[in-house]
């Protein structure tokens, strides 16, 4: 099973386990809600899909790496309590609440969400003293004498023994009480995530050329060398920041993330070439419709990996513009909705209240900011959604300052001022949309002149289809040449599939 399918299964499980019947009781009794056990190599994204699943299901998440805990923190600390049993006063041992269970209740209070996912990582790597506690947790959904609160779905994760020497095998009694999912690395599935997460285009381009270097764990006499999906993503974030700061990422830095000597060396060399191609070919000039004639001459003798790198650079530039357009559009839509609410609020104000509109606007802003903080704390905002809300709040602060500067007293006067401010934001949205559309047309002009209907054009159109930002932009704004090339590509695929079916049919008849 790949990581995408595992995420879907977790989301479906959360919805099923939290579904209620007509009486308000959980449709599946807690005793029949089997914990999910994810088994897969390290760095594949098990923890990350838990965050995504919780956010998309609108529930809370408490995540623990159990190897960081002792038996006392998992079960609770013992203390003596006096009891009266059968006419006798006796001293009995009881336990404080488990730190993990306490964290669940604390999360419920902090977020206001009463249902969620309790995720325990590295569950099969615990110490000998904690192993019985983990078995009890999976079998009975308790830590010590404290049960996991109702409405919380249990998900655990572990590594197969070939990746971790500390692994302890579960017995059949435990395995018969869980839903086990075995996860394997899958580059194509990871690339779908990487496109949506805006991972660095050099990494995606490199892995297109060297898919075998996506995920490796090799043990030799010098120790274990490895590269994981987590390593590529963390490196991507650093590369983006280094570029923004004007810093150079060398091989020594890359080795800190890609802890496989040959792959780190290979990617470092590719990254240097990638930046060189960006400068030599003038990618920004191409997207501005000003490609130099020398570029076409150079491409005639360029090797395939160089041509593919250039296509990747063009796609990266386009996706940056598509993302900017989408974010400008989202911010404008949110500000427009806020403006409509403000108009309704202004209608309730008497005209003679000093700073009435500005004061009301400030209160609405405060409520908006509080809602953002709450959703952020609850983990319900994606990176893009958070960026949009922060952008909107910054715009609203500017609008409030204009209201106070203009000393608008009348509600109509205040609304007219805000409407003027919104027009500037709307103009920014239109400019971002126009910049993206113009760059897309320039890119197609270049691709047609440089590559015509070659394999590079197939890659270009395919990536536009698969990249969420590109697909959304083209769907909303259109692009005749994209639709034509995409149609031709689909026809070619169908024709090839039909030819394969006919060939298979002929082989079957030939063998009779």
Regions found by a protein language model. Give the residues of each.
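AAA+ P-loop NTPase catalytic core and its hallmark functional loops
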Residues: 1-212, 217-220
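Charged/polar, solvent-exposed surface patches and flexible loops
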Residues: 8, 12, 16, 55, ...
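Alpha-helical lid/collar subdomain of P-loop NTPases
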Residues: 196-359
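Generic hydrophobic, helix-prone segments enriched in Leu/Val/Ile
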Residues: 10, 100-104, 242, 436-443
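Terminal-proximal interaction/regulatory segments of ATP-powered molecular machines
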Residues: 300-512
